[in-house]
A protein has these predicted regions:
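Short, surface-exposed beta-strand/turn modules with glycine/proline-rich turns
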Residues: 1-32
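C-terminal, surface-exposed recognition/capping segments
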Residues: 23, 35-183
Length: 183
């Protein structure tokens, strides 16, 4: 992403400079420990790893809609029922499955990761400020990858019924970021 995460220009040339957020120290980890997944890594995680479809599911966690990702060697904690997959209903996160704070704590301790359906900051191409708005909060998630497709960026997109890679976004859109580190 760019060096200024709150920058809202709709001019492509303004986003030529890439900033490696991995140089920032997080929780005392050395610099260059954390990074953003590539589109290929998102694709592997969501679709291509063994048993990928069984290792993700939409849910509402503590009244927040989102997508849960599970590790390869995941074992479901006792007294928790996890249903993998997507809902057949638009906005059906809570109808599909819901977890309390205590249940989520147990899931998280077992390696589960939650991606909130945080929507995105929309800045329509060719339209001047102040047209910025937030869109899709609690409806869909859109997460940057570190991969480009020409002048655009590739992202992970999900809602309650669908998940996919290659949702192409112009750089002025404000998407969520999930940092990862090698273990």
């Amino acid at each position: 992403t760019g060096l200024n995460p709150t920058f809202t220009s709709n001019q492509w040339k303004e986003y030529d400079t890439f900033f490696d957020w991995g140089v920032v120290s997080i929780n005392g980890d050395p610099q260059d420990t954390w990074r953003t997944l590539t589109a290929e890594e998102w694709d592997y995680l969501i679709f291509k790893r063994p048993h990928a479809a069984a290792l993700l599911g939409v849910a509402q966690v503590k009244k927040v809609n989102g997508l849960i990702l599970l590790p390869d060697d995941w074992e479901c904690p006792e007294d928790i029922v996890f249903t993998s997959g997507m809902s057949w209903n638009h906005g059906g996160y809570a109808d599909y499955q819901s977890f309390t704070f205590e249940q989520w704590t147990s899931l998280e301790l077992s390696g589960a990761v939650f991606l909130p359906a945080a929507g995105m900051r929309v800045h329509p191409y060719g339209v001047q400020q102040p047209t910025l708005r937030l869109d899709g909060i609690q409806t869909y998630g859109n997460y940057w990858s570190s991969s480009r497709d020409g002048n655009d960026a590739v992202s992970l997109y999900f809602d309650s019924i669908w998940v996919g890679i290659s949702d192409i976004q112009i750089p002025s859109q404000g998407l969520s970021v999930r940092l990862v580190k090698e273990l």
